[in-house]
Amino acid sequence: MIPAVVIGVFFEKELEQLFGGNIMLVGCMLLVTALLLFLADKAKDTQKKVSFSNAFIIGVSQAIAMLPGISRSGATISTSVLLGNDKTKAARFSFLMVVPLIFGKIAKDILSGDLTYDSGNFTSLSIGFVAAFISGLFACTWMIALVKKSKLTYFAIYCGVVGLIAIIFS
């Protein structure tokens, strides 16, 4: 998580510029995601817990996943599994490690004035928050179940196909 904070704080403008329609970059990064997912799916299942040094390396993969086309959860789960960590713990850790980043970004945007609140939208915002929370819980539960069953190859194929299409049409 710490590497992602450093990259996000010091290179925010440069990262934002990468999201300006560079389809070739997105396609190439989708291929990287596909490779990571495929390798992780083939890794041996262990019962190893996430160590501090592994957490830092997983944080580096989370920072790299700020590039367009790299799945953050795919990169962190794959990195964790390739380091020998238990697949279920890897998936849970991946979803937990993004929470401080989300709250940190919200706090930064509020303090800088980039994010404001209009009390007239309270109901809409509340409904959106609840819907996002429920769908997020569902998605996390589903993804953890897929990781447990070693079904990441399906996502790898999807990322590979979409990546190739993006490269061909860029």
List where the protein language model places each region.
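Multi-pass membrane proteins that catalyze or facilitate reactions on polyprenyl-/lipid-phosphate substrates
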Residues: 1-170
